[in-house]
From Swiss-Prot:
Family from the record: Belongs to the stealth family.
Additional notes on this entry: Stealth proteins are part of a protein family that is conserved from bacteria to higher eukaryotes. Family members were first identified in microbes as proteins that help pathogens to elude the host innate immune system. Microbial stealth proteins are involved in the biosynthesis of exopolysaccharides. Stealth proteins are predicted to function as hexose-1-phosphoryltransferases.
Coiled coil residues, start to end: none
UniProt gene name: sacB
Enzyme class: transferase
GO biological process, one term: polysaccharide biosynthetic process
Keyword terms: Exopolysaccharide synthesis, Transferase
Record-level Gene Ontology MF annotations: transferase activity, transferring phosphorus-containing groups
Record InterPro entries: Stealth, Stealth_CR1, Stealth_CR2, Stealth_CR3, Stealth_CR4
Protein EC: 2.7.-.-
Name of the protein in its database record: Capsular polysaccharide phosphotransferase SacB
Transferase is among the record's keywords: yes
Domain of life: Bacteria
C-alpha cells in the first residue's frame, strides 16, 4: 500500500487544490478538491496517530519506490485487496463472498456510515492510483468529480462498481467488479438492500455476539462461530499425473518395454512436455487457491523449475502407490487404479492432467457440494456402447469394459464420457470399487501400456458408479477441449479475449490443450499453444524456483 507522508498530509489539509494539481494520482485529478478536503477534515475516524503508525511499517522496498515517487506493482488485484486497503483506513462494514466466485462479492455499509466510508474509499483509490467505474441508471459511468459520485451514491441503496489498475503485470488480473450496498438501521435490526446468501435481516442482539458493523470490514459469515451450511468443512487436494518424454531414464525404459506395434497408447505425443505443468500450476494458484495440497504422480525426475520446498507441493513416485510387480508402467489406466493410495491424500480430491488449465476464479463449490457429493461434468452426448474392439481408441475400450461392470451392478446402461476437465474424486469410493472389482483393478494395474482388457477407472467407472450410488450429480459447468484437428487458433484466441474481458459467464471452467495423433509434429499447433500459455499465465507461481 502507498502511504502519504506527514508533509503530504499537511499539504492536503492546507492547500487541497495544490495537492491535487501536483499529485500524480490519476483518479482524483479531476475531482473538486475543496469538496474532498472538506469531507476529509470532517471525518472523525482519520487520525494522525494512524498515519504515523502506518509509516513505521513501510517496507524498505516501498521506501525506495517513494524516492522515485512510484507505486509498487500489485501481484493479486482482487476484492480481497480493496477490503485490506479499507481496513487500513479503519473503514467499518461487512463483506459477503458469493458461493460462486464468478459472481460479484458485496461490500455492505450502514447508511449512517456512508459519508465517512466514501471519504476513506475515495482516499484509498486515490492513493492506490485505481480507476473507478460504476453502473448508474443502466449505464456504466466514469465519474469526473467527487460531487458527481456523492450525488449518485446518496440517491441509491446499492451499486455495482468496477475497480481497475495498470499496476499489475498481467492484464487478466487488472480489474474486478463488486457490489456496494448501504444498509438501513431499525431499532431492532439492520436491513440489507438486497438478498444475500446468509441473512438479509441482521438482528441487533446478534451484533452483541459478533461485533459486526462495529470495527473493521468483517466477513458477514462471522454472524456465527459455526460454518454455514453451504460452506465446505473438508479439505480438497489436487492430483496431477505427469511424464517428461525427455527424461533419459524414462526414455531407456520406454524403449525397453515398448511393443513392436504402434497405437495411440504408444504414440510419443502422449508423453510430450511443453512445461504444461508449470502453466497448469499457475492457473490453479490464480484461480483455485482453495486447494490444500498438490500431489504430482510421476516416474520421472521433477522439472528443474519446480520448487519442492514449497509445503503445498509433494512429488509422488509410482513405486509409492503401485506394487513393484506393476512397474515400470506407461499406462495412464494403470496409474489411475492407484491414485487413492497416495499417502496423506484427502478423501476429497481433484484429479487433473497437466494439460487442463483453469480459466476463471473457482472455489470448492465448483467441484463438490457442501455435503460431499461430487460434481461431474459429463459430455453432452454419449458414445460408449458395443463391445471392445481391437484397433479402436483405448479410452473407448476402457470405458466399455467399465460399462459392463456398471450394468451388472446397477441394472442400467451408461454412455457418457467425462469431459476433458478436472475431475471431482473421492478416495472412499475408489477404495470401495477396488474391493468390489479386484480382478479388473489388478489386471489394469499390471498392463504396461493401455490394453484391450483395461477398465477406465477415473475416465469412466468412478463417475457413473458415484452417480448411480447417489454420491455424485451432474454439473452444468462448461469446459473447452482444443485439439489440432479443431479450429484451434480461433478457440484459443476466444478464451484469451474472454479472459481479458473478465467475461466469466462465457468463459469455460477449464480448457484442455489436448495432444494426440502426432500433434507434436504440427509446427503451427505448437506455436499457437505456447503463445496461448504464455499469454494467459505470464506470471510465475510460488511453486517455481
Amino acid at each position: 500500500m502507498f502511504i502519504l507522508n506527514n508533509r503530504k498530509w499537511r499539504k492536503l489539509k492546507r492547500d487541497p487544490s495544490a495537492f491535487f494539481r501536483d499529485s500524480k494520482f490519476n483518479f482524483l485529478r479531476y475531482f473538486s478538491a475543496k469538496k474532498f478536503a472538506k469531507n476529509f477534515k470532517n471525518s472523525s475516524h482519520i487520525h494522525k496517530t494512524n498515519i504515523s503508525k502506518a509509516q513505521s511499517n513501510i517496507s524498505s522496498t516501498l521506501k525506495q519506490n517513494r524516492k522515485q515517487d512510484m507505486l509498487i506493482p500489485i501481484n493479486f488485484f482482487n476484492f480481497e485487496y480493496i477490503v485490506k486497503e479499507l481496513n487500513n483506513q479503519n473503514a467499518i462494514g461487512v463483506y459477503i463472498l458469493p458461493s460462486n466466485l464468478t459472481l460479484k462479492p458485496a461490500l455492505c455499509i450502514l447508511e449512517s456510515h456512508k459519508e465517512d466510508f466514501l471519504n476513506k474509499f475515495l482516499l484509498t483509490i486515490s492513493s492506490e492510483n485505481l480507476k473507478l467505474q460504476y453502473k448508474f441508471n443502466g449505464q456504466i459511468k466514469n465519474p469526473k468529480s467527487v460531487n458527481e459520485i456523492w450525488t449518485d451514491l446518496f440517491s441509491i441503496a446499492h451499486v455495482d462498481m468496477k475497480l481497475s489498475t495498470d499496476r499489475t503485470l498481467s492484464s487478466s488480473i487488472s480489474q474486478f467488479w463488486f457490489r456496494l450496498e448501504f444498509c438501513k438501521e431499525d431499532k431492532d435490526f439492520i436491513l440489507f438492500p438486497t438478498a444475500n446468501r446468509y441473512s438479509r435481516k441482521l438482528w441487533k442482539h446478534s451484533i452483541k455476539n459478533n461485533q459486526l458493523f462495529k470495527e473493521g470490514i468483517r466477513n458477514y459469515s462471522e454472524i456465527s462461530s459455526l460454518p454455514y451450511e453451504e460452506d465446505h468443512n473438508f479439505d480438497i487436494d489436487l492430483v496431477f499425473t505427469w511424464v517428461n518424454s525427455e527424461d533419459k531414464n524414462w526414455q531407456e525404459l520406454y524403449k525397453k518395454y515398448k511393443p513392436d506395434f504402434n497405437s495411440d497408447a504408444t504414440s510419443t505425443s502422449r508423453f510430450l512436455s511443453r512445461d504444461e505443468l508449470k502453466f497448469a500450476l499457475r492457473s490453479w494458484e490464480m484461480n483455485g487457491s482453495f486447494i490444500r495440497k498438490i500431489f504430482i504422480v510421476s516416474n520421472c525426475a521433477p522439472p528443474a523449475w519446480l520448487d519442492l520446498n514449497n509445503p503445498k507441493i509433494q512429488w509422488v513416485y509410482h513405486e509409492e502407490i503401485m506394487p513393484q510387480s506393476a512397474l515400470p508402467t506407461f499406462s495412464s489406466h494403470a496409474i489411475e487404479t492407484s491414485l487413492h493410495h497416495i499417502p496423506g491424500i484427502s478423501n476429497y480430491f481433484i484429479y487433473s492432467n497437466d494439460d487442463f488449465l483453469l480459466t476463471k476464479p473457482l472455489n470448492k463449490d465448483n467441484f463438490f457440494y457442501s455435503n460431499g457429493i461430487a460434481k461431474l461434468r459429463l459430455e453432452a452426448w454419449g458414445n460408449v456402447n458395443g463391445e471392445c474392439t481391437e484397433g479402436e481408441p483405448d479410452y473407448l475400450n476402457g470405458a466399455r469394459n467399465a460399462n459392463t461392470l456398471l450394468e451388472k451392478e446397477f441394472k442400467k446402461f451408461t454412455t457418457k464420457l467425462h469431459t476433458h476437465s478436472p475431475q471431482s474424486m473421492r478416495t472412499d469410493i475408489l477404495f470401495e470399487m477396488e474391493k468390489k472389482y479386484p480382478e479388473e483393478f489388478n489386471r489394469t494395474l499390471h498392463n504396461k501400456f493401455r490394453s484391450l482388457d483395461d477398465i477406465a477407472v477415473t475416465g469412466y467407472l468412478y463417475h457413473h458408479y458415484a452417480l448411480l450410488s447417489g454420491r455424485a450429480l451432474q454439473s452444468s459447468d462448461k469446459t473447452e477441449l482444443v485439439q489440432q484437428n479443431h479450429d484451434f487458433k480461433k478457440k484459443l484466441n476466444n478464451v484469451v479475449t474472454l479472459t481479458k474481458e473478465r467475461n466469466f459467464d462465457k468463459l469455460p471452467l477449464s480448457v484442455c490443450i489436448n495432444d494426440g495423433a502426432d500433434s507434436h509434429l504440427n509446427e503451427e499447433w505448437n506455436v499457437q499453444v505456447i503463445k496461448f500459455l504464455e499469454t494467459l499465465f505470464p506470471l510465475p507461481s510460488s511453486f517455481e524456483k
